[in-house]
Regions:
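A short beta-strand-turn-helix
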Residues: 10-40
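N-terminal chloroplast transit peptides
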Residues: 1-3, 7
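Short active-site neighborhood of thiol/selenol oxidoreductases, capturing the structured segment around
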Residues: 31-67, 73-74
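Short acidic, S/G/P-rich loop/turn micro-motifs used as interaction or catalytic elements
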Residues: 48-51, 82, 238-239
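Thiol-based oxidoreductase modules, predominantly thioredoxin-like and allied folds used
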Residues: 69-84, 96-104
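Thiol/selenol-based redox catalytic cores and closely related redox-interacting motifs
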Residues: 102-238
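Short, surface-exposed basic-aromatic patches at helix termini and helix-loop junctions that form
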Residues: 65-66, 88-94
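A short, polar/charged loop-to-alpha-helix boundary motif
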Residues: 237-258
């Protein structure tokens, strides 16, 4: 369903000009900020309490000024309710006006996003199997990357920070530099971010996940051009797989952000 054969690679991800799903255009039709005339980045998050949703928001927030400079308007849509959205924004720093919620996964399904593993026994056995890498491509290797470090990924903490996970005693971030160096993602650095996120979610589970029927539902990313054509789409297939380039989750935006710098 290509409207054009124009394409170019971004870190091994091929961008094509495609038709935007009607379900997405219908969802944003009444939102003035999402009107045609500007590029729009629409992120379909999973459950508000999903680790992918947390990490995706934490990747987006520091880049909001660059998105604005590039003329790209952002909208995130997650599964949950307003109480969960309020807490999510307070924790991640996501501006509340950029996040909307859906009570179920109907929009995700209409956009052909993966429902995740559907194992006998319901969503909880399915989620546990996905966490073990079953029916969830790339999950185990991504978990491991959080512990081993990644020289192709950016540093997560400044040396002067004191990291509180809510589980361990406060950690001086300078320990990561002494243990692994600086200027890249050090061993255990990303795992510490994930531990902090996990503690926040588990302590407030019912707020973040008011309906656990959709805990395996996966998300997706849609970048729309000013004429509503689709510049980029990514549909994730597994837990901790919200980007095709997890070491730099927003690498697909490089052609537009770098041009605006």
């Amino acid at each position: 369903m290509l409207a054009s054969t124009t394409e170019f690679p971004v870190h091994r991800v091929v961008i094509r000009i495609m038709q935007t799903p009607e379900a997405l255009l219908s969802r944003i039709a009444d939102l003035p900020a999402m009107a045609a005339g500007s590029k729009r980045l629409i992120v379909l998050l999973t459950q508000l309490g999903d680790f992918d949703s947390m990490e995706y928001a934490q990747a987006l927030v520091p880049e909001l000024p660059r998105l604005e400079q590039a003329g790209i308007r952002l909208l995130a849509i997650a599964i949950g309710d307003q109480a969960g959205a309020d807490r999510f924004c307070a924790f991640t720093g996501m501006p509340s006006e950029l996040l909307q919620v859906e009570p179920d996964a109907r929009l995700h399904q209409a956009l052909d996003l993966s429902p995740g593993l559907q194992a006998p026994g319901g969503p909880w056995p399915s989620l546990l199997l996905m966490c073990a890498g079953i029916g969830s491509p790339g999950t185990l290797s991504e978990v491991l990357r959080g512990y081993t470090g990644d020289r192709s990924a950016p540093q997560r903490f400044g040396d002067d920070e004191v990291v509180s996970t809510g589980v361990l005693p406060p950690i001086p971030a300078g320990l990561f530099r002494r243990a692994g160096g600086e200027g890249f993602q050090r061993p255990f650095e990303l795992a510490t971010v994930r531990l902090r996120n996990m503690n926040e979610v588990l302590r407030n589970w019912s707020t973040y996940v008011p309906d656990d029927r959709f805990i395996t539902q996966r998300g997706g990313t849609f970048l729309l051009d000013s004429d509503d054509s689709l510049l980029y789409v990514y549909r994730d297939r597994g837990i901790l797989g919200f980007s095709a380039t997890m070491q730099r989750p927003l690498a697909f935006l490089d052609p537009w952000l770098n041009h605006a710098d």
